[in-house]
């Protein structure tokens, strides 16, 4: 199922929280949504889930829209918010049985989800007695139980231990790659986004500032090196159009961002121009590197 988000705008009172949001998520793609607190991530996710109404714009799941095809739209989407909304007087098991009955889920699938939730006998107790972590496990389990064609997860590892986070990651990758389910995931834990997502969208102050950071295909590299003559080196860099970014970490120590296929020619040019350097280190560009770079460019 392809998801198309078209010209979404949202205001709260006189404050604009989303401005002309346009993005596409392909069938089977896992997309990360990254931004500071208050950037508009949760609002966008709630609009996608049909919880919040935008001022203008539309969200389409293939050709389904919330406004015209509400029942079918909601059948095809599973949504987990940062602070799960549960019926506190019902038990976790009551929630599971209710969703399973609505969606004609097999007992094998129910047993698999109960194992994933992993809260023991507490599953039979009222949700009012659950910790945040237990509520998060249950909400995730219910989303995975339903298995809509589009899963939206807002801070899904909040309250989860390491083993549960790893298990969730494996399950989401399986759903995307084996069952062609589309997934949008927001998290402040960039390492989690990096491990699971195909592509990352950066949002700031309600605006998408980059939507094509492809974690699977990026060919960018970081080069960290110490140069003997700082002025000479900076003069060379100012004339080199292949350098995508430059940061002076400390005196005479620089961090450069460059395409991987240009590294050898860059190093050869330094030698040819007698620009001497020491302690050169080459590494992949991480999501954190890109996040910092994007923030600095604004």
Model-derived features: positions:
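Catalytic Walker B motif of ABC-type/P-loop ATPase nucleotide-binding domains
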Residues: 151-155
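Conserved ABC ATPase "signature" region
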Residues: 97, 101, 107-123
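The feature captures the beta-strand-to-loop junction immediately N-terminal to the Walker
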Residues: 34-36
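Conserved ABC transporter NBD signature motif
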Residues: 57-68, 72-73
